[in-house]
Amino acid sequence: MSDKCIIVRGGGDLASGVIHRLHRCGYRVLILECEKPSAIRRKVAFCEAVYDGTAAVEGILCRRIDSLEECGQVWQAGEIPLMVDPAGNCIIELSAQGKVAALVDAILAKRNLGTSRNMAPLTIGLGPGFSAGEDVDYVVETMRGHDLARIITEGPAIPNTGVPGMVGGVSKERVIHSPGVGRIHNMAHIADIVEKGQILAYVGETSVEASITGVLRGIIKEGYNVPVGMKIADIDPRKEEKKNCFTISDKARCIAGSVVEILLSEGVLPNTL
C-alpha cells in the first residue's frame, strides 16, 4: 500500500466531483484551497469546509485541518483533509518527502495560478490556462460538448469563450453576475424555485434579479464581498431537477473519469491496492 497522496488544488463543485471520485476509488486526497472560496454550487463543494470546518458531498466528508500532521488521522477516519494554502507551499514540502503521487490543478481560474511540472511526479491541469507538455503533463478539457473530458497530451484546452454551457437549453441567461461592488445579502436559497424578475440578493444597495424562471442551482455565500461582474448565481430552468442542487454534475463526473484514467495509465494506483 502506497503512503503517497494526490493533491488537488481547488475545492469548487467541479474539483469536488474529481475529489469525490478519487476518494471512492481508494486514493488519499489532500485539498488545497484559498482563504475565501467563492463557490456557487456550494451544496456540492468541499471548499465550504474552509468556512464551516467540514463539508459533505454525496456522503463523503471533508474536514479542514491546520497542519499536515493531521492528514493521517483524517484519512484513517475515511474523510478528506483540506488545508488553506493558496500558494501551494505544502506541495513542495510533501514532494520533498516523496509523499506526492500526483498534483491536479482544479482551480478552474481560466489561467495558471502557479502550477508547474516540477511540483510533482505527475501533473494534471483542468481546463484552459494550461499547456500539456509545458506547465503540466496532461490537460483535461472542461468545455461542454463533444470534447468534454478529452485527455490532452500536447498543447492547451479550448480557450475560454466566456459563454456558459447549455443546461436545459439555456446558456448565458442562466448565469448571474454581480451588478455592483459590495457585500452580498441573499434573499433566496439554493434549491428554491425562483421566478424571472424575483430579487435573489442585494449587492450593497443594488438588487440582483433572477434572469429566468427555474431552480436556484447555486448562489455565492452570504456576506461575500463581490466585485462588479463576478459570477454570483446559477439558475437551472428545469424546475423538476431540484435534486440536482445536491448532487455532482454530469460534467464533473466526466472530468473525474478522465483524471482517474490518467492516474491509472501512468501507474498511479489507489492507496488501497
Regions found by a protein language model. Give the residues of each.
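Well-ordered secondary-structure scaffolds
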Residues: 2-273
